[in-house]
């Protein structure tokens, strides 16, 4: 029992130093950063106490209990204690100055504090997540770090980063010597694993389909407590590797917090696990910590947006090569129309590195950097170029089919699909006759020949691609979610909605003038 308790305590103490300190363990005389969270918020030298317990247990196992074992154990602990008091603490006081003296005044040496501030507690799950990131993710993806000197020495501050894949929080969070509270979308909390990991770090969800005042207050409260908060200003992961627009509401929230901003740029994260891919790929990632944006440079919202964009987005996306035997797996959900004939839902995966259009028969070879070529030409194009090409005339071909409802004057339907389920927070409708239609004026939910619900584009505040092949709209603070069939492509619906909404806003503006 003594050995197990001692081992657990010593390992936990070392992990805290490796994560939040400078990585120099107990007998170092050149400490540059001390740890004041977890066990170190309760006593200045937890490793000493756990070491004493451990070595006493070892002596008991090999010699059994007697008085000389007890005195030997106390003697070893006394030597270690004298080293801590006369050498290490003295050097730390001289090296770290007033900050360490304040720490000494607040944290005892001879006993443990049982009550500490909430922001000084470090959970087991938080340590587990960090350890997974360091031992597995950093090693597997060979993460390279740049600009670590830009990480602030003092809290609080806000981290903003481009968002390219599920692993983004690991790819930079493991290098920041503070516990980070991540602001995530509420959808991430739908899986048991992500809920376990995220709640363990104190992260919290923010709803995108309405103003989430509770989450906003939570974020502001954490900042006021001196914690580090990370928010992804795009509001979601990139689909094709190109950056998403920065949300104005997020910018205003960041500006309201009035703390320094640490921008982070991730290069290569999209390639190792694209949003459309069910499988991860082996590749290299570079994490770049950019210069801090001070509070005094945040007064103008447009200038703040420009600074954040400049730091977290690349001027030109260059796709890094990855290792994968099935690089095309899931790619039909990205390339939702043929580059040549523009037929929708026609791209099929034929092998791990090839695609084919079922309509015109064109075959495409996909390289390890996601570039595409045909047998008839050596010129390659990126998936981003492919998407831009099929978006160019996307509104020129409205649907020519019978719909289960009557179109309004000047209304043109562009997309229609049967759906598996429709739900809000209070309502669930699930049958085989549901259909979803997107026109240049509205989104319509129908059942056989009956129009069930209709939402004007003017009233829709947000359209999102969700998990498990679903899309959602936000209307009046209510989220309406539509589960699509497996063959339907969410990116296609997002693209059409964005373009139709843009046309609708432009026409509405012209009519007002």
State each model region's role.
Residues 9-23:
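Membrane-water interface of transmembrane alpha-helices
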Residues 23-41, 185-188:
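Juxtamembrane helix-capping/reentrant segments at transmembrane boundaries
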Residues 46, 159, 436-445, 450-469:
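Phosphoinositide-dependent membrane-docking surfaces
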Residues 326-376:
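Cys/His-rich short segments
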Residues 374-435:
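Anionic N-terminal interaction surfaces
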């Amino acid at each position: 029992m003594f050995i197990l308790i001692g081992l657990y305590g010593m390992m936990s103490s070392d992990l805290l130093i490796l994560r939040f300190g400078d990585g120099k363990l107990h007998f170092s005389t050149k400490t540059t950063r001390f740890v004041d969270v977890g066990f170190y918020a309760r006593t200045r030298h937890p490793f000493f106490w756990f070491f004493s317990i451990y070595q006493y247990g070892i002596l008991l196992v090999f010699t059994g209990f007697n008085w000389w074992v007890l005195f030997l154990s106390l003697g070893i602990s006394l030597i270690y204690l004298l080293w801590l008091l006369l050498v290490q603490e003295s050097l730390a006081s001289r090296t770290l100055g007033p900050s360490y003296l304040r720490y000494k005044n607040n944290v005892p040496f001879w006993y443990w504090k049982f009550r500490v501030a909430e922001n000084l507690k470090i959970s087991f799950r938080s340590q587990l997540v960090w350890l997974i990131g360091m031992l597995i993710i950093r090693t597997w993806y060979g993460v390279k770090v740049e600009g670590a000197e830009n990480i602030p020495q003092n809290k609080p501050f806000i981290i903003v980063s481009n968002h390219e894949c599920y692993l983004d929080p690991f790819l930079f969070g493991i290098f920041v010597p503070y516990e980070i509270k991540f602001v995530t979308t509420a959808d991430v909390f739908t899986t048991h694993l992500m809920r376990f990991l995220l709640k363990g770090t104190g992260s919290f969800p923010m709803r995108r389909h309405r103003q989430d005042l509770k989450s906003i207050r939570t974020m502001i409260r954490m900042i006021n407590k001196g914690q580090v908060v990370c928010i992804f200003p795009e509001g979601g992961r990139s689909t094709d590797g190109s950056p998403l627009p920065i949300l104005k509401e997020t910018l205003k929230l960041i500006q309201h917090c009035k703390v320094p901003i640490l921008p982070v740029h991730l290069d290569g994260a999209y390639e190792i696990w694209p949003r459309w891919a069910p499988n991860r790929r082996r590749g290299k990632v570079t994490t770049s910590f950019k210069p801090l944006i001070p509070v005094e440079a945040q007064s103008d919202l447009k200038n703040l947006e420009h600074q954040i964009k400049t730091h977290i987005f690349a001027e030109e996306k260059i796709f890094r090569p990855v290792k994968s035997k099935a690089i095309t797996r899931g790619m039909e959900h990205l390339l939702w129309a043929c580059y040549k004939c523009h037929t929708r839902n026609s791209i099929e995966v034929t092998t791990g590195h090839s695609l084919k259009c079922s309509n015109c028969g064109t075959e495409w070879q996909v390289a390890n950097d996601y570039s595409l070529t045909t047998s008839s030409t050596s010129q390659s194009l990126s998936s981003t170029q492919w998407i831009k090409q099929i978006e160019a005339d996307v509104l020129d071909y409205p649907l020519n089919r019978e719909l289960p409802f009557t179109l309004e004057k000047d209304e043109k339907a562009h997309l229609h699909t049967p759906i598996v389920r429709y739900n809000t927070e209070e309502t669930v409708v699930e049958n085989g006759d549901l259909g979803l239609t997107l026109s240049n004026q509205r989104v319509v939910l129908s059942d056989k020949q009956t129009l069930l619900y209709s939402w004007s584009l003017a009233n829709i505040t947000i359209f999102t691609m969700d998990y498990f092949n679903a899309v959602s709209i936000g209307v009046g603070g209510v989220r309406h979610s539509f589960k699509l069939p497996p063959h339907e492509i969410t990116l296609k619906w997002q693209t059409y909605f964005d373009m139709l909404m843009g046309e609708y806003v432009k026409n509405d503006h012209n009519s007002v003038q």
